[in-house]
C-alpha cells in the first residue's frame, strides 16, 4: 500500500519524504527543489505568508520537519513562513537552514496556551523582540517540570511591562470566541495585537468568518488569515492523527474530538486559500510579515570575560598562562617548532576572538585538578599545542604531527570543539562548579534531540492503532533485529504478520515516516553553553529531568550553525577506574603513581596486550579489538594509537585494515609515490588511517588548509548526501599534476570515502591511547588493584562484575592470579577493598598480590546508606550476633533479607539457609518476660552447591564457588561437548562442539549482519562468529540462550582464535532459574 492508497485526498504535487539533517542543508534539499522546478506560481493568485505553523518540534503535534515545510512553502509561492512551535524555539535553527536553502523568508515565533485558556502566537518583529520572546518561553518552561510549561496572564504582563514590545501577537479565538481575551491582548500589546482567522473547510466556516470579522471590528483589531498548520501536506494527516493518539495515550479509535475533522491544517496552495479567505485577510498576512524584519542569523553572542584579571586583556592573559604551561611541560626548553606552532595558534585565536573560550576551559580543568578529579582533553583539541601547554590535553605535540586546521580554522568560521573527559562519578562536581561560577542565568547544558528509531516508533504507532501488546512486542522485535541484507518485509512475515492486512500496512507506513522524527528534548551528555549575558536573551532555557540542571532548547548542531561556543564536560568511566586504582596502589602498596608517572613503554605490558589479555581495559577490550591485537602486535605507544583507530567503521569500509596488516608483516609491500607522501603516510605504512593524514595529503597536493578542512567535512557528510564528486575531480587533477599513478589516486580516494563512516582522528586516538596504556600497565603490574578499581567504578565498560572477577581469579601467563573473598558484614566496606598479601605467584612476575574483599555495593537491594551504618557500627565494636547487627545498624526488613540472600552473614550465623531463617524472624524472637529462656537455635543444613551458585548470581551477580559449567561438566561430557581449554590443542579448521554461558553479544554496523558471541565456561572464554544466515535461522537460540551450545569450525590464524558457528542450540534449561549477566549489543 502506498501513501496515496492509505489516505484519500492526497496532494500529489510535491515530494513527501523526510530528509535527514546534515550540515549542508542546501545539498539535501536540492533534489526536492529539482523535482518541483516545474511548479509555476500562476499570475493573479493572492500573495500569502503563513504566520502560524508548527514543525515537528512541537512534539507529538507537528507532523512535518522544517525542511519539508519550507520546500512546500516554496512550491506554493509563499512570501514568508513563520515557525511557531508551542512555547519553543527548539526547531527554529532548522527553520533558518531550510529558509536559506529555499529562499522562503523565516519569521521567528511561538504559540502559547495560558492556564486560563487564552491562546495566541507571538511573532518577533525586531532585535528587541527576540530576547522578549526567549524570556517569556524561559519563564513558562522554568515554572514547570521537564517537557511542560505553565504561563499565566501575570507572567505575560510582567515580561512586557515598561518595555516597548518588539513582537506581534496573533489572538487565536476558540470555538466560542471570548472578546475579553482579545481585549486583554490589546491591553498588553496595543496595536500590535491581531486577530487570526483560521478556517479549515468545516460546516460553520461562513458563520465563523462573520463572527470573527465582527469581533475584530468591535475590538478595533486587524484580522488576518492563518492556517494553524500541523503538516506540510494533506497526505501527512495520518501521521498527525497518530501523533495525537500517542500524545493522549489513547487508541486512534477512542481519540474522538482530539482529532482534527479533516486534513486542512497543511500548507495549502494560494489558489485554495483564495477560495476560502477574503483578499483583505490574505493581504494582511503579507503586510505583517514585511514588518517582521528580525534575522536570527544576525544574533550576537559574547563569551564571558570575568576570568581576565585586572591589567590584562584576554589575549595577554591567555599568553601568560600558555607560557607558564610551556615552562612546566618542557622544563629543559621548548622545541623551536612547538614555540612556532604556539605563536601561530595564539595569533589565530586572537584573530577569531576565542581567547575567553580557551580561558574558560582552562579554568574548568584547573578546578578539576585542584579537587584531584582526573580529567583529560580529547578529540581534535589534541592537535592544539596551546591546549597541551594549558594542561587541557595530554598528548605531547612534540611527539606527534599537529594539524591545527583540524581543530581551528579561519575559513570555517566556526567555534573550536574542546571535549574534556572527567571521572564519571565526579563530573557532577565539575558541572555544579560551572553553574556556581557563572550562575544559572548564564550557563546551561545544550539539548539533545531524542528522535524515534524504528523500534520505538513501531511500538507507539502500533499501540495507537490498537494492536494487542503481544503483537506489538513481536512487531517491535522485527525492528530490533536483522540486517541490511534481509528485507524488513521478510522479517515481518516471518514474525507471523500479513502484509496484505491494511492495518499492518498503515502501521508500517506511519512507522517509516516517524523514523528520525523528534520525540522530545533531553540534555546533552555534557556540552555547556556559557554567555556573558543571560542565556535567555539568546535562546530559551528550560528545566532538565535531573534536579539542579537546566538546558537550552538548541542542540550541538544548532549551536554550530549559530556559532555559539560550548564546553564539553564529558564523563568517562575509565578515568574513575584509573583514579580509584591509583588510590588503592598508593594506600595498599605505598607506590605513588600518577597518569603522567606510570613507566613508559613497558615490555611486559605490551606482551600482555599482544596476547589480547585485555578484559576490562580501555578501548581494546571488545572482541573485535581482541581479535586484532595478536595480528597487529602493538609494541610501542604509536601502535596503540593505530589499534584504537583501526577497528572503526571508517578504516574497515575504506579497506584499510588488511593492507595495513599485510605491510606490517611484509615491509616489501610498502611504497610511496614521493618523499612528501612518505613523510605523511610513513607512520602508517602508506595507508591513510587518520583524517589528519587525508588532510595533509591534499594539502601536499595543492589544497590550502581551510580547503582541506572542507574536504574533511564533506567526508563526514558524504554518506548522508554530501558532495564528494567535486573533490574527487580536483584531487585527481592535482595528484596527476604531481605525477602520481592513477592506481594510487584511486586507492587513496576510496580510502577517503571510507571516512564517511565513523573514524577516529589521530589526535583523538592518541588521547585515548594514553588511557589504553595506563589501564593495561595497571592490569599487568597491579592486577588486584585494577580489578578492584574496575569493580568500584561499575557500571561501565563491556564486562560484568562476574566476568571481571573470573578474569582476575584466572590470571594469565602474563599476570598474577588474584584471590577474591566474599561479601561479609564482619569485614566488607561499601566499596571492594584490598586485603593482605596472597601467595599466588607466576613465572612472569614473582611479586605478591593482595586479595580483593568484595564490598557491600555488590549486594543487590542494599543501599550505600545502610552499608555505611553497618561499617560505622562495626568500627565501634564487633557484632556479637545477628540481633546486635540488626539493632545497631538499624536494618530494615529489606536490608536484612538482602544480606541473608547474599551470604554476607556467614561469619555470624553460618550458612545461607540459617541466615534466611534468623533474619526472617529477627523481630519476633524477643523474650516475653525478663529472664525467659532463649529460643534454642535450629540447625539448618547448608544449601547444595547448585543452590548456592544460583543464590550468588541472583543476589551478588557473581559467584566465587565453582563455575556453573563445572557442575554441568558431567552432562557436557555425555553430550561430547568440550571444555574451552581443550580447544587449545585442536588443529586449525577442525570441527568442534562446545557450550558456554553467554556473556556478550555484539553486532557491529560494519559486519553485515554477523553476530559475535562470547561464551564462558570454568576454563575460560572464546569468541564465536555467527554469520548472518545462521543468525536468522537460529535467531531465538542466539538471542535468548543463557547457555548456548555451538557446533562449528575452530580457527587459529596469526595468534587469533575463534569458533565459526555451523549450528547453535539452547541448553538454558540445564541452568534452571539461574539468571546470568550478559552485555548484549553494548
From Swiss-Prot:
The processes (GO biological process) annotated in the record are: DNA repair; DNA replication
Q: Which family does it belong to?
A: Belongs to the DNA polymerase type-C family. DnaE2 subfamily.
What is the name of the gene encoding this protein? dnaE2
List the catalytic activities from the record.
DNA(n) + a 2'-deoxyribonucleoside 5'-triphosphate = DNA(n+1) + diphosphate
Keywords, ordered alphabetically: Cytoplasm, DNA damage, DNA repair, DNA replication, DNA-directed DNA polymerase, Nucleotidyltransferase, Transferase
- What's a Gene Ontology MF term here? nucleic acid binding
Its biological purpose: DNA polymerase involved in damage-induced mutagenesis and translesion synthesis (TLS). It is not the major replicative DNA polymerase.
What Pfam families does this protein's entry cite?
DNA_pol3_alpha (PF07733), DNA_pol3_finger (PF17657), HHH_6 (PF14579), PHP (PF02811), tRNA_anti-codon (PF01336)
- List the subcellular locations: Cytoplasm
Give its E.C. classification number: 2.7.7.7
Q: Which domain of life is it from?
A: Bacteria
Q: Which NCBIfam families match?
A: polc, PRK05672.1
The main location class comes to cytoplasm
PANTHER family given in the database record? DNA POLYMERASE III SUBUNIT ALPHA, ERROR-PRONE DNA POLYMERASE
Question: Is this entry keyworded Disulfide bond?
Answer: no
Q: What is this protein called?
A: Error-prone DNA polymerase
Please give the GO cellular component terms listed in this UniProt entry. Answer: cytoplasm
Q: Which CDD domains match?
A: DnaE_OBF (cd04485), PHP_PolIIIA_DnaE2 (cd07434)
Which InterPro entries does this entry report, sorted A to Z?
A: DNA_pol3_alpha_NTPase_dom, DNA_pol3_finger, DnaE2, DnaE2/DnaE/PolC, DNAPol_HHH, NA-bd_OB_tRNA, PHP_dom, Pol/His_phosphatase_N
